[in-house]
């Protein structure tokens, strides 16, 4: 098998022959130890215990290394739960890759006897941001600049929450046409009980800071495989300081959304969530309070390396008459880039197509940063 083929996550030589379920594994290990003892090899068995632990995502993550999805906690009450890995590593010739850890368990509920099933995944993608503007905005803005995301610690360019994150890699990993390479991580999953009850149940990453550690570990392995790693590996050493606020119901059409003066929406059946509010990043999400459908996504990005993911898609003309900088207002997304307090700032909008929403947000963010309004007077609503 070539290194570009999809391959299972690496295992220890003898461990790879063991079942992936806990009960089957323990039974076979016990039988092997007894057999070895009976043949005079008990000392060898004792000297080499414990068996090598499974590793996942190009060797970045080790079984039982902290977060629940890598330990027995992932299986709940199921003694036969399984955890499997598959991966394709990036290379110098093909600097894209992916890895996935999948967890499955089925057991009978001790409370009501219903059959319970969980299927969970943690997926990592390594590669450049898309060329097309809409695809790039959908990936980065919709996926990783929501109101529940916060900046990565230690000045790392990216965002994170308890279900995943995005990290922009150093310029040495850029494509020949200048697009940054990013590593993304997402946890997903479902929980089913009985014949009719199903809910979202993402794999447990251990919180936002642990998710940042997992993301950076995968990024370091990916960069090494692709031949673009920096001299020193990226590290997470600080806590997360900028935690997002809780979602809050919007009770009136006159209420300011996400604490932004003058940003009013035309419906009351929504809730807003404010994420980071720093000089480098500001995020806001508005969703339906019953169905969670996105109603409005807003972000300001001034961190240079994170903002680089939008290079080349901000256009050459103002977004509209009287607006500063350059940008476009499309059917699904809007983007504006303008100088603000001595450096470029990028203002983004998703879900809504109303330029007044972006105007209110951009002008409020610009005022907070100490620079001139982005949109002309009267454009906000």
Spans of features found by a protein language model:
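Hydrophobic membrane-insertion alpha-helices, especially the h-region
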Residues: 18-44
